[in-house]
């Protein structure tokens, strides 16, 4: 069984017991979170779609760690002016482990 859920405007696909990397969410490491915005549930026998979300369903997950993503370099350059500016950016990410999908 797997589900498609939405957190902070982004949709993710998850199975029970899997680890999902998503944009940073607030919370301490080891704390339990409950996700109620489930858009679709896929089981062996049936498929359930929400309009837009499924009522009385939830995903229970724990926060494993907060990490930084891969560094992205941004370069500004002007020709013939001897100007070059390089900046970098790292996205903040959170790994969560899906414990249970309740429907």
From Swiss-Prot:
Organism domain of life: Bacteria
Database matches in SUPFAM superfamilies: L21p-like
InterPro entries per UniProt: bL21-like, bL21-like_sf, Ribosomal_bL21, Ribosomal_bL21_CS
Keyword Cell membrane tagged: no
Signal peptide: none
Self-association state and partner proteins as the record states: Part of the 50S ribosomal subunit. Contacts protein L20.
Family: Belongs to the bacterial ribosomal protein bL21 family.
Protein's UniProt name: Large ribosomal subunit protein bL21
Species this protein is from: Wigglesworthia glossinidia brevipalpis
Top-level taxonomy: Bacteria, Pseudomonadati, Pseudomonadota, Gammaproteobacteria, Enterobacterales
């Amino acid at each position: 069984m797997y589900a498609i859920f939405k957190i902070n405007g982004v949709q993710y696909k998850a199975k029970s017991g899997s680890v999902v990397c998503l944009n940073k969410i607030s919370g301490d490491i080891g704390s339990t979170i409950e996700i109620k915005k489930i858009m679709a549930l896929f089981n062996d026998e049936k498929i359930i779609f929400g309009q837009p979300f499924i009522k009385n369903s939830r995903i229970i997950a724990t926060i494993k760690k907060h990490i930084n993503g891969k560094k992205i370099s941004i370069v500004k350059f002007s020709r013939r002016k001897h100007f070059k500016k390089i900046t970098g950016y790292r996205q903040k990410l959170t790994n969560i482990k899906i414990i249970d999908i309740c429907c």
